């Protein structure tokens, strides 16, 4: 069963807040901007992670230095999974943070 619009927005809002919390708690020098449902994480070296919601598809999209990725929410496992690789959003974020900032962060709770 697909997500309702309200459930989708609640999930994306919570996920974006959890991502912000991980970066805030890390002490890493990043700029966080959340505007109109788009979360942008700007790293010291100029690279970015951009999270946006695609309401018609009920997907969370991520733009990173290595490309663009689309995530569907898996209600059974309560996680976002990439629609092309099934890799979890949390795993990708851990990898991208190392690639773009040289720091390991734990996103397992998002």
From Swiss-Prot:
The entry lists its GO molecular-function terms as:
ferric iron binding; ferrous iron binding
Q: Tell me which GO cellular component terms the UniProt record holds.
A: cytosol
Instruction: Respond yes or no to whether keyword Mitochondrion is given for this record.
Output: no
Q: Fetch the Pfam families from UniProt.
A: Frataxin_Cyay
Top-level taxon in the UniProt lineage: Bacteria
Keyword Iron on entry: yes
What is one process in the GO biological process aspect for this record? Answer: iron-sulfur cluster assembly
Listed A to Z, the keywords are: Iron, Metal-binding
Q: Which family does it belong to?
A: Belongs to the frataxin family.
HAMAP family on file? CyaY (MF_00142)
What the protein does comes down to: Involved in iron-sulfur (Fe-S) cluster assembly. May act as a regulator of Fe-S biogenesis.
Protein name per Swiss-Prot or TrEMBL: Iron-sulfur cluster assembly protein CyaY
Q: Which organism is it from?
A: Pseudomonas syringae pv. syringae (strain B728a)
């Amino acid at each position: 069963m697909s997500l309702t619009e309200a459930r989708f927005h609640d999930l994306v809002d919570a996920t974006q807040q959890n991502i912000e919390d991980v970066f805030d708690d890390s002490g890493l020098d990043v700029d966080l901007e959340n505007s109109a449902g788009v979360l942008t994480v700007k790293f010291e070296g100029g690279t970015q992670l951009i999270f946006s919601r695609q309401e018609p598809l009920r997907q969370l999209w991520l733009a990173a230095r290595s490309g663009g990725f689309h995530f569907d929410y898996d209600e059974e496992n309560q996680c976002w999974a990439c629609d092309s690789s099934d890799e979890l959003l949390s795993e990708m974020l851990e990898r991208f943070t190392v690639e773009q900032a040289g720091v390991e962060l734990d996103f397992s709770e998002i």
